[in-house]
């Protein structure tokens, strides 16, 4: 990694596009232990603070005619609640707080990461893998607690012909265990790829002939990234809802 | 500019992004074709649209991940 990071002259870029994802300690240098405050810690804390500020301050006035922050808070609440209710049904609504937390954290972390010179915690597989594994274990344990061994019916496709069912069971089993992998990599990969593309165009801006094109490209990519930030948070949340529905109603 | 086989492999893995683009385009195009025939049913199916796009896109992201691994981890 170090040789690529300093390889400015060989690639023609002023900086390496992946340098923005390096985790650094906030104070001084030295090794990073688990308790060291890093830039990842800072931006995760900032996004949690932003969520709390939006939801607590937004709903504190309880105006009949909502102001701007209250509208945003109510809109996001209603949006997620409707999603959970549509996909998981009425009995899934009690898991709404967890899903709301996931969505708000991801979407705010994604948006804060779009501020220039900031750091994007959701671009790290370590962050998204923890969230995806938490969903995976929660959903699996919930499925067994709610349905007992009937949860295994998720893998036994009773609508298929009997001869096909063992093969389908193996496929379903594999796809079930790949879920946390694809769930986490989708979010981190999208965010990381988007930010890297912006940095690649920013590197081209140093070349005089290309700079107008690259500035235009950065503007366009930035607009796309705002969209992607929201859509990936939405997709992460909606897939959590789908997995939760599988746990609550495992029959095919 | 030096390079080795890993860089060629990373470039080849980028083809996967194009394949994912075909998949995502298929999903969105078919959704639009269906939505224009029956616009009243379209709004209720946007969640399905995004799930389909997410599944198609995940495999392209896997290709991107392979490219990243070849660039930085091998």
Swiss-Prot record, chain B:
Cellular component (GO) terms are: plasma membrane; proton-transporting ATP synthase complex; proton-transporting two-sector ATPase complex, proton-transporting domain
The chain's disulfide connectivity reads none
InterPro entries per the UniProt record, alphabetical? ATP_synth_F0_csu, ATP_synth_F0_csu_sf, ATPase_proteolipid_c-like_dom, F/V-ATP_Csub_sf
Where can this protein be found?
Answer: Cell inner membrane
What topology does it adopt in the membrane? Multi-pass membrane protein
- Superkingdom as given in the UniProt entry: Bacteria
What Gene Ontology molecular-function terms does this entry list? lipid binding; proton-transporting ATP synthase activity, rotational mechanism
Mitochondrion listed as a keyword: no
Q: What does this protein do?
A: F(1)F(0) ATP synthase produces ATP from ADP in the presence of a proton or sodium gradient. F-type ATPases consist of two structural domains, F(1) containing the extramembraneous catalytic core and F(0) containing the membrane proton channel, linked together by a central stalk and a peripheral stalk. During catalysis, ATP synthesis in the catalytic domain of F(1) is coupled via a rotary mechanism of the central stalk subunits to proton translocation. Key component of the F(0) channel; it plays a direct role in translocation across the membrane. A homomeric c-ring of between 10-14 subunits forms the central stalk rotor element with the F(1) delta and epsilon subunits.
Please state which protein family the record places this protein in: Belongs to the ATPase C chain family.
Name of the protein in question? ATP synthase subunit c
